[in-house]
Each structure stands twice: as structure tokens, then as C-alpha cells.
Amino acid sequence: MAQAESSTEVVLVDIEGTTTSISFVHDVLFPYAKENAKDYLLETWQTDETKLIVKELQQLPHYTEYAANLATQPTLDAEAISRFVRYLIERDLKVTPLKTLQGLIWAKGYADGQLRGHVYEDVAGAFGKWHQDGIRIAVYSSGSVAAQKLIFQHSIAGDLLPHLSAHFDTHIGHKQQSESYTKIAESLQVQPQHVLFLTDVPQEAAAARAAGMLTTLLERPGNAPLSEEERKKFSSVADFTGIVV
């Protein structure tokens, strides 16, 4: 059992592999965005929001590489852009305009009842207890803030957003850089040593620890196994029931 110091004021959680299964993100969300990109672009092609996303997609260096490998110059229409979107998703390229578009597609899917956010069965109870005990819960994920909120608002355990006080994505910095965690602590107006960061990625835990935060690794089913060295370096738990704050 991981014993956090009693002075913990904020629990900062990762999503993928921590609150939510990696398979949900890779086997449900990503394919859903890939399969529905064309229809969404066709439906919203004339909106300012979509026009901006398309412009930003075309400005990516990946677009130049993609276009150079085509037999003919790509056209500027929903079908052509959706093919580029599939290209990005298949290569797991985490670029901002793609994340924005994915978030919008997912928002429609959640609103239509076609998607529900996965959370492990211990998450809702832990969130409720920490919130009741006056401990703030914040989220830090590579997924956009909008996408984070959708997972928790439309989760299989109900709407968990009321438990969450702040959301951070890569706009604040890379998850494996200690400066990002320093900025998060500053944004939360809390000293880093009063923040417990929960993640499944040792490199992220190392960055958070370098910033002065407490850290615990999650060993969820489907997560990459920890090495013996990582087990010695960090505390780890199987689920949130093993965390005491």
C-alpha cells in the first residue's frame, strides 16, 4: 500500500493506464475518430472551427511529407483531409489540430450516446472520498482538456467532473519534463511537495519527482510491466484502493 504524506493537498492523475484502460483509448476512442472523421468533416466543413483545424492540419510538416508520397496533389475537401487524418492516427502522431478534431468527433459521439468513458471500478469511489476529505483532484494527460472532460463527464460510473478541480494537457508542457509539473503546482497555487502524482509511466513519475512532487505508479492490467529497478525507485499500487492520502 502506498502511504502518501498527510500533507497531500492535491492528487494529480494521469488518465491512460491510470484512471482509464489503455485499451479504451487505443481500441475505442482512436478507431472511433478515425472511422467518423470523414462524416464529421463533411457535416461541419463550412464552419469556422473546422476551417481552422483544416488550415492547421495543412500547415503540419507531416502534411508536406504525406502529400509528397501521393501520386497526385491532394485536393482540399473533406474526403482528402479525412485520409490525412487517418494517416496521422495510424502513426500515433500526437499533433494539436488532430487532437482538437478528435475531441470534437468524440464530443459528438458522447452526446449521441455512442461513447461512454471507461474508468476503473475503484476510481469513482476514490475520487468521492478524496473530494469529501477536502483533497483537490486534478488531471494531467496528453489528451486535450476537452477530451479529458468528456471521458469523466460521460463515464460508465456517471458524471465524475464535479470531483475534479483542474485539468492540464500538453499546452502546459511535455509530461516527461519536470518544468511542466512545476508549472502545474504554480497554477494550482500549491507547493509541489503537497501534490501526489499518479501515473503508469516511470519517466513521468521521475519528472514529477524532480519537481518535488510525491509519486506513485499504477500497475493496471495491460500497462507495461515495471522493471525491478523501477520498483525500487518508485512506490507502486495495483489500483486506487492501495493509496492513502
UniProtKB/Swiss-Prot annotation:
Entry protein name: Enolase-phosphatase E1
Protein purpose: Bifunctional enzyme that catalyzes the enolization of 2,3-diketo-5-methylthiopentyl-1-phosphate (DK-MTP-1-P) into the intermediate 2-hydroxy-3-keto-5-methylthiopentenyl-1-phosphate (HK-MTPenyl-1-P), which is then dephosphorylated to form the acireductone 1,2-dihydroxy-3-keto-5-methylthiopentene (DHK-MTPene).
Catalytic activity reported: 5-methylsulfanyl-2,3-dioxopentyl phosphate + H2O = 1,2-dihydroxy-5-(methylsulfanyl)pent-1-en-3-one + phosphate
Keyword Metal-binding: yes
Annotated residues for binding of substrate: 141-142, 175
UniProt cofactor(s): Mg(2+)
GO CC terms, sorted: cytoplasm; nucleus
Subunit note: Monomer.
Subcellular location field: Cytoplasm; Nucleus
EC number: 3.1.3.77
Pathway(s) annotated for this protein in UniProt: Amino-acid biosynthesis; L-methionine biosynthesis via salvage pathway; L-methionine from S-methyl-5-thio-alpha-D-ribose 1-phosphate: step 3/6; Amino-acid biosynthesis; L-methionine biosynthesis via salvage pathway; L-methionine from S-methyl-5-thio-alpha-D-ribose 1-phosphate: step 4/6
Keywords from the named record: Amino-acid biosynthesis, Cytoplasm, Hydrolase, Magnesium, Metal-binding, Methionine biosynthesis, Nucleus
Alphabetized GO MF terms: acireductone synthase activity; magnesium ion binding
Cofactor stoichiometry and binding remark: Binds 1 Mg(2+) ion per subunit.
Residues bound to Mg(2+): 14, 16, 200
Broad enzyme group: hydrolase
Native organism: Drosophila grimshawi (Hawaiian fruit fly)
